Amino acid sequence: MKLWGGRFKKDLDKLMEDFNSSISFDIRLLKYDIMGSIAHAKGLYKAGVLTEEELNLIEKGLKEILEESELKEIPQDEDVHSYVERLLVEKIGDVGRKLHTGRSRNDQVATDERLYLRDEIDKIKEDLIKLIDTLKEMAETYKETIMPGYTHLQRAQPVTFGHYLLAYVEMFKRDLSRLDDMMKRVNVMPLGSGALAGTTFNIDRYYVASLLGFDDITLNSMDGVSDRDFVIEFLSFASITMMHLSRFCEELILWSTKEFDFIEMDDRFSTGSSMMPQKKNPDAAELIRGKTGRVYGDLITILTVMKGLPLAYNKDMQEDKEALFDGIDTLKMSLKVFTEMIKTIKVKTDNMEKAAKYGYMNATDFADYLVQKGIPFRTAHEIAGKVVLYAIERNLPIEELSLEELKKFSDVIEKDVYEAIDIKNILKKRKTIGSPRIF
């Protein structure tokens, strides 16, 4: 069913018909299209456009369409809107043709997308909270498991595995706050904007918005139909969240190698090689890392689509949906897989703690010890560097150098230096909020 055509002399070319169609992907909006249509019908009734009997017929017909919406094959209609209207007219006759009064597909689809995204945001919030809770539980378990902390992928200072996990908790908490803030801009209703210039029918937009659970309405009809900031903002959020997952996955992939040997991936989230029998590959983590680029691509798609569009609606904007849907699907699956994967890793605490004892990661605390003895930090830093070089040349850790050797570098060094640079004591002495302190 076409929702237009009166001013045309020729039928649409079959090639153009296929090119123009969006039903194969926007059918996902069916539930939300029907929700919006029911609310719009109630707005038309309140405005005196529909009788009570007509409203009841339309509402009943739309609900039946939703109940019968399991598709055996993709319909041949142009889009989800024309599909719903065709079914409605088939069910209730010409009364169904009144539904589109005072409405354009431009404000209709913008409303559908916001309703859909609103629900998806709630689902993603649940997934993020589950991941955060999982990491918090693991951090409690490993709060005293000492491991190397890295900068430039070089051993830097000792931390705990629990502290490391909580670093990602902070990242995902920021992602969660972005979702909450975004909802203020997503949950605004454009319905009533018409094609771009509103409508002559006195539809109470605030009433319709309240029926659909929107917090507010758009205040400019041209912006209402042409705004896709909410799609861009969501995909920006999704890209940042995927980036956090990807960084986490990169470290897990590295740590699962024999070169690090800090963790082992569970069989349920690993695969083998078709040629090399010994292989156990961290494919779940690698796929999440790879799919991050896919979500970045979704964001770039909509940014590129929108960058040169004049006001108001343009058909280019049909391209927003596949990017949005793909970004949502990819993020949701990645969050679910990652949460289950991280719960099942085997943490090799002995290897972590062994690695923390090497690499001269107590050098900073050696310098701090000298500062506490009255030496300026910059001088203490230089002395500590010379001690590290001396220890490296002898293939010894600092703590295995004799007191006599250490005193060659500064006469303020006493026997208490060994307590000051002990790895466990280092973490017990951390004082600032946010440090990896062991109690």
Curated annotation (Swiss-Prot):
Gene name of the encoded protein: argH
Organism expressing this protein natively: Caldanaerobacter subterraneus subsp. tengcongensis (strain DSM 15242 / JCM 11007 / NBRC 100824 / MB4)
Highest taxon listed in the record's lineage: Bacteria
Record's subcellular location: Cytoplasm
UniProt keyword annotation of Amino-acid biosynthesis present: yes
Record lineage: Bacteria, Bacillati, Bacillota, Clostridia, Thermoanaerobacterales
Name of the protein described by the UniProt record: Argininosuccinate lyase
Pathway: Amino-acid biosynthesis; L-arginine biosynthesis; L-arginine from L-ornithine and carbamoyl phosphate: step 3/3
InterPro entries attached to this UniProt entry: Arg_succ_lyase_C, Argininosuccinate_lyase, Fumarase/histidase_N, Fumarate_lyase_CS, Fumarate_lyase_fam, Fumarate_lyase_N, L-Aspartase-like
PANTHER family listed in its UniProt record: ARGININOSUCCINATE LYASE
A single Gene Ontology CC term: cytosol
